Amino acid sequence: MSVDKAELCGSLLTWLQTFHVPSPCASPQDLSSGLAVAYVLNQIDPSWFNEAWLQGISEDPGPNWKLKVSNLKMVLRSLVEYSQDVLAHPVSEEHLPDVSLIGEFSDPAELGKLLQLVLGCAISCEKKQDHIQRIMTLEESVQHVVMEAIQELMTKDTPDSLSPETYGNFDSQSRRYYFLSEEAEEGDELQQRCLDLERQLMLLSEEKQSLAQENAGLRERMGRPEGEGTPGLTAKKLLLLQSQLEQLQEENFRLESGREDERLRCAELEREVAELQHRNQALTSLAQEAQALKDEMDELRQSSERAGQLEATLTSCRRRLGELRELRRQVRQLEERNAGHAERTRQLEDELRRAGSLRAQLEAQRRQVQELQGQRQEEAMKAEKWLFECRNLEEKYESVTKEKERLLAERDSLREANEELRCAQLQPRGLTQADPSLDPTSTPVDNLAAEILPAELRETLLRLQLENKRLCRQEAADRERQEELQRHLEDANRARHGLETQHRLNQQQLSELRAQVEDLQKALQEQGGKTEDAISILLKRKLEEHLQKLHEADLELQRKREYIEELEPPTDSSTARRIEELQHNLQKKDADLRAMEERYRRYVDKARMVMQTMEPKQRPAAGAPPELHSLRTQLRERDVRIRHLEMDFEKSRSQREQEEKLLISAWYNMGMALQQRAGEERAPAHAQSFLAQQRLATNSRRGPLGRLASLNLRPTDKH
């Protein structure tokens, strides 16, 4: 019977609101974007519908129906993949909704199909009990519609989900494991079913008794004559009672036939219960035997582990004895080195005492040398100052001499010009008389002749006079500026010369100090004493370094002695006997069934001991630089050994896992064969009714299919 998709959409909307998603989901229009459905799927299975998948859904598509269709396609694709890959429930074509109608028109029928797929994922996931409890809290009408949708989905998915091709590749080991677990569950279900049928039979018998009593009462009433009432009313009552009697007789007959069927069914169920109990006893005995074998294997494994631990302890003790001998040798070397350092320290102290007696004399001589150097530097500065003044005076003298020569040359040129002018004075006399402005000594009466000169000549003469005055003023200003620059140049030269003098004096002083230092060193070497301050500082530094090394050597020696005391093996005779007994037990464990596991444990313990022996040798390596190279070499060798041990461990572990898988698979196959043989022996040889044959065929088909379904729902319980 198909469910109305519109009604289903409304009921599933009510169910969807119980998830409390951030997106609204009260109407089909709210679900047309696909965002609310995506949030619900994220709550159903966060591992599959994770946050990365949720971010791929567009959060606000708005009125754009194409974005809504894109979101719905992504949600539908993920739903189908989840059903096929995780739940192993392939979705048929008739259950796939048309997402374009949902995104564009919010079609309730197509939306109901989509929500029906979401419901199927919810009741088939790992949290299905929580979702079923959530459905039970809804209204009764909503529960009825939801249950019809689940039944429709399961009835249409059962043929596909229970096909042999889907479950043909399961491991026989897991199949046998779940088959054993289903046997006990089927026995409990059949027992509960028998109890329910007995309870129904009791209720039907009580109901039959009550109906018989009521029938007897009605017959008594019919037999009594009624004094009151009309005959028509009596006839009507009689007809009514007869009809009720016929109905009750029919109901009684139906109940009798149903009781007979239930009795037959109960007998068949009792036979099935007896068979299942017999099978349960056989399986219980097999389980007890398997548990006993498992306990024996655990004991053997513990003994092999104990043997490996004892062997590792023995190996570590031997290694520690070798290390103890090596540490004793190192302690002897450190003691010899410590004695050498102590002798060197005493020698340095004697040299320091001899050098202290000459330090005061050296300080007095150094102060005198510094005073003499200061006086010499002052005198040198004065001499340089007078030398610079002398050079300046010489430069001034040279400049004055050059100026004198220039003035003499200018005087000669002026004399020649004056003579030439005197020679030519006779010719322009008339010009001078005509223009009295050219002759400053002429009287105003003589200037009357100047009017005879043309106007252009007079303007030219005036312009030349003004130009001459301007040039004279400019020459005076340039001369003042040149004098000022000359003064600045002299100041700069004086400062530069002073700096050069200071530099030269410093260089000379430095060379003198170096020469003095060399002389003093030579003198001290000749005298055989080391009284210089630098040498005393060097001796102090060397003494401090030797004292520090001596202190470090003492600390190192003390640490190694403590470590030797810790590594010192006990001399108890019982411990020696115990070690011999353990060695004897180790030789007896060579033929154990768990040899590979023992080898694995031994390698792990050896690697741990190597790491533990590396740590105490890394700490004293800081105080013993000569042994650093050997320790590093040992560390590299142990790293290589650890890598080899890890590779061997990986190989042994993989081989051990394969052996366990083969052993368990063979065990389960043997149990399956024994059970099949027992079922064939218990099969009834006499003829059965048609109904019994059909029930046996149904149960035989239901058993493997039910086990396959349980294997499908729980494929990872072993892990």
From Swiss-Prot:
Keywords: Coiled coil, Cytoplasm, Cytoskeleton, Golgi apparatus, Microtubule, Phosphoprotein, Protein transport, Transport. It comes from the Eukaryota. Its main location: cytoplasm. The modification Phosphothreonine is found at residue 230. GO terms for molecular function: dynein light intermediate chain binding; identical protein binding; microtubule binding. Residues 696-719 are annotated as: Disordered. CDD domains: HkD_Hook2. Residues 584-719 are annotated as: Sufficient for interaction with CNTRL. It is found in: Cytoplasm, Cytoskeleton, Microtubule organizing center, Centrosome; Cytoplasm; Cytoplasm, Cytoskeleton; Golgi apparatus, trans-Golgi network. The keyword Plastid does not apply. The modification Phosphoserine is found at residues 163, 710. Self-associates. Component of the FTS/Hook/FHIP complex (FHF complex), composed of AKTIP/FTS, FHIP1B, and one or more members of the Hook family of proteins HOOK1, HOOK2, and HOOK3. May interact directly with AKTIP/FTS, HOOK1 and HOOK3. Associates with several subunits of the homotypic vesicular sorting complex (the HOPS complex) including VPS16 and VPS41; these interactions may be indirect. Interacts with CNTRL. Interacts with microtubules. Interacts with ZC3H14. Interacts with LRGUK (via guanylate kinase-like domain). Interacts with CCDC181. This is Protein Hook homolog 2. The gene is HOOK2.
